Amino acid sequence: TALYGPATKVGGLVGYNAGTVKDSKVDAKTLDLSNLIANDSTVTAGGALGENTGTGEKLNVFTDLTDSMAKYLNLGGVAGSSSGTLSKCTYTGAIGKDNGFTTVGSTVGGIVGSNDVVYNTDGTAAATGKVKDCKVGYIELKVQGASNVGASQDAATKMNSAAHIGGIVGRNRGEITGSTVGNKDKTGSIITARSGFVGGVAGSNSGSISTSGGLDTQRLVKQINAWLEVPYKNETTTDENGNKVTTKVVDTDKQNDNLNQMVRVLTGKASGDAEKKLQIDFKAMQGFDTLTYGEKDYNKVYTNRSYNQLLVSLRGGSGWGHFANGYLGGITGFNDVTGQITDSASGQWFVYADNINQSWGAVGGVIGQNESDAESNSGLVNFAAVRRFVRGKGRWDGRYNASNDDDANVGCEEYSTNANLVDNYVGGVIGTQENRTGDRWTLEKCVNIGTVFNSR
């Protein structure tokens, strides 16, 4: 499908939607903007809707969005941007190219690029973008990305200093609920950029994400929550006047039983048929680190992706000194001050930070960099294999050179002893926790089940 003429809001069905578009399908090989008359970084485009302030429901998009990347500001599989509602929408296809151009502030997402909030003059929300029960099946999202982020910047400055790349939403300021990425078959989807905020669900989050993440993870998240829920019982005692007093107290026996069962199931020591069934289900959901347990071949990480449902990656440029800059997380790369995430889990994924900036890049199975001031981020589960890797220097004619490519094996064995490397951090749930607003942050019912590897 080719589009012609001047425009900055472009959709496979509707350029600007303030009404309702539902029960529609876009099935085109590609959405071609090469003949569109527009300046760079000005176009908001989606496979179905350009800008949405109304409702898009049951929109199923099967198309590639890979042309004229320099023109985009907001790009999404279903909608470019939305302050309305996107409900029960699906996307399958390719977005961007290996080094497809995106600029600071740009957004790219499997469902919508930018999920927005519109404010009244008094600061209250007039409209909130909602992504509900949407699904991204097979996706190849590959962009260059962009980042001018520095470790000393405050959260607001960071949000405006990077590209936002996510499997469902690029930049989320609204609400994401009940939405997933992945297929039942290990089809090897990929979300990758060389710079910016990258996440399996959202590149960045300053809104809310709940009950979202990997396919078929929700029942296992509910089981984790049940194990970690504090049980209570009524206890009757007699006071100093001989009166019976009933109070609610923690049932420590039940609590210990639940925790012991969780440990048995998650460590492969299940007892009884019910526990063994759970053990199989949890084990089957774990992501696979192809560089630890697979072929251990760096030049096949990006081409042979059949081990996992999804590869989420920040991918540095060729050579030891060409670092990727940004934050990488299974659910979100950057959780902003107002961001809140609940009851969500990465899936059978590989979260891979390849040659990421040593000084301030952050990598986490759920959240890369967390600066949230939310009262609680709870019910977070990581199933993904998480790896952060800094390349060694390649050799050529006996001299050290920055010559190894980002998918080459040369020099990779030297990473652990190279004197130029500095300490860096990777986490199963959170890569880095930044207390910019004091000590007001709480994690509840969070569990890492995936493997975690750091090259330092």
PLM region spans:
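Surface-exposed loop/turn motifs in large extracellular/passenger domains
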Residues: 1-456
